């Protein structure tokens, strides 16, 4: 099935980004699961998140350029040196992940926000011919929307830190290598 369509038709570079994103998502899930089971203090969680973010950055999941419309209208995006790319990527991945985790306090809020963001990412990804990002965002949107049915008030199931870390990281990672204005990678 993998080679008959979908991800099997993507370029090997995109395949690497997909696997790196999914490996990072699994690692973030495991950090969150460990927090759910053992009530980790914030510093070990943050250290683990930064380590995983650095690892996926080394595999190509990175913010390589920043587009400032008021500054780069004619010049295009500003390419970041590796040190700034690493810093921007780590702040983005860890920041979005923790933002989604903070939203998980109310029934349906984290999954609803992440689902809406993923649907928007699907639309933008496919309109820019970013098929790999579109497929991953569509899968994430489907997960969120399927979960929401059981997570509305009164919630019957809960995402926990593992689920919210997975959602946040996957959303942030797909956005970091997925749709970029004017690109057709």
Where are the regions a protein language model picked out?
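"…together with the soluble PPM/PP2C metallo-phosphatase catalytic core" -> "…together
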Residues: 1-185
